[in-house]
A protein has these predicted regions:
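Conserved nucleotide-binding/hydrolysis micro-motifs of P-loop NTPases
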Residues: 37-39, 61-62, 130-131, 162-165, ...
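Phosphate-binding/switch region of NTP-binding enzymes
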Residues: 163-196
């Protein structure tokens, strides 16, 4: 199944983090990929401590999209493509032997919803994936192919504002988080532990 959390409201990443913790608590694997988040977000500190969770993120700081040079855009595109390829490799490793290279966590295999192949439960989070897709900072063919070939044993969560039509069409769950009020309207900056 595919989940999409979009909109201008706060909480899209928080929803994805909650789902990741729930899956890890149930003994499943989690691949949590974060795109276009500049500063270290505090949620990654706890996710990295969970042995069932693999966190993938571009570690280099590129700044805001409108401040990136053409060289920066080319570099971050390559790094985003590497993350997508690594996600595919991790899913294949988990499907084939019940563990990923990085984590070595055994989980009980279970039948997928169609009963075709036995494989462990996997949750893949593509946090803020809408931005690189909309701004051509990722090979969209990789993303589209991944959506089409998502194994039945996996759940996929996508977050970000302004999702593309194919993301909406592919989703089984779609929630649009709408901002009604936010402290930044009063000049209050983002606070650690709350917004990041």
């Amino acid at each position: 199944m595919i989940h999409l959390y979009s909109g201008d409201g706060k909480g899209k990443t928080s929803i994805a983090v909650g789902m990741a913790i729930r899956m890890a608590g149930a003994g499943g694997h989690v691949i949590f990929a974060q795109f276009m988040k500049g500063n270290e977000s505090s949620e990654l500190n706890i996710l990295r401590q969970l042995p069932q969770v693999k966190v993938l993120k571009v570690e280099k700081e590129f700044g805001f999209y409108n401040e990136m040079s053409d060289e920066d855009k080319a570099e971050i595109t390559g790094l985003h493509n590497e993350i997508m390829r690594e996600i595919v490799e991790c899913v294949e490793q988990i499907k084939s032997n019940g563990q990923s290279n990085a984590e070595h966590i055994e989980v009980q295999k279970c039948e997928d919803n169609t009963g075709k192949d036995a494989c462990p439960q996997i949750l893949i989070v593509l946090d803020e994936i809408t931005y690189p897709c909309r701004w051509n900072l990722i090979d969209e063919k990789l993303v589209r192919k991944f959506l089409k070939e998502l194994p039945d044993c996996a759940e996929l969560v996508m977050t970000g504002r302004d999702p593309l039509d194919y993301m909406i069409e592919a989703s089984d769950y779609w929630s649009d988080v709408e901002m009604k009020r936010h402290p930044f309207e009063k000049g209050i900056s983002a606070r650690i532990g709350i917004e990041y």
